[in-house]
């Protein structure tokens, strides 16, 4: 993208803050559905960073594959499992949290040191023409039939997943004869030699 340097810096800061905030929400939120949606926000932020690097095809692939396939697959898995039990508290969970925070801080320190000590060279190459337009033209001219077949296949998979997710659990059917028959009345025992009064 041919943007001014100030616009690129501001866009990078916004996308980086959005990505880091969404990633923290994925880890800290207890609701799995919210975590899945925030994971989609992380993927979209990464796609925006690819756009700033003039990698438009990689950005489109990021959105199509990770947001459109992986994230949707995670959401369908959550809906199909439909587990409503709360997580059991873990004894001394603060030790695990402290260890995780220490590892994350160490990785962040290593990456920061690498970024600050590396002599980055500013590229003066002229950006080439966008390749995603050429790929789109090929999709709708030379490869139109495979493209449409793939879209129909994905549509069938989506409809099947929706049907499975919206299915209703019916109770077990009772025996069909129980509603039409009466239980048999127990017969009274009659001593031997005594006539039945009904006779």
Curated annotation (Swiss-Prot):
Membrane-topology descriptor: Multi-pass membrane protein
Entry's EC annotation: 7.1.1.-
Transmembrane residue ranges: 9-29, 32-52, 61-81, 102-122, 143-163
Location within or outside the cell: Membrane
Record GO terms (molecular function): NADH dehydrogenase (ubiquinone) activity; quinone binding
GO cellular component term, pick one: transmembrane transporter complex
Record keywords, A-Z: Membrane, NAD, NADP, Plastoquinone, Quinone, Translocase, Transmembrane, Transmembrane helix
S-S bridge residues: none
Function (record text): NDH-1 shuttles electrons from NAD(P)H, via FMN and iron-sulfur (Fe-S) centers, to quinones in the respiratory chain. The immediate electron acceptor for the enzyme in this species is believed to be plastoquinone. Couples the redox reaction to proton translocation (for every two electrons transferred, four hydrogen ions are translocated across the cytoplasmic membrane), and thus conserves the redox energy in a proton gradient.
Protein's name according to its UniProt entry: NAD(P)H-quinone oxidoreductase chain 6
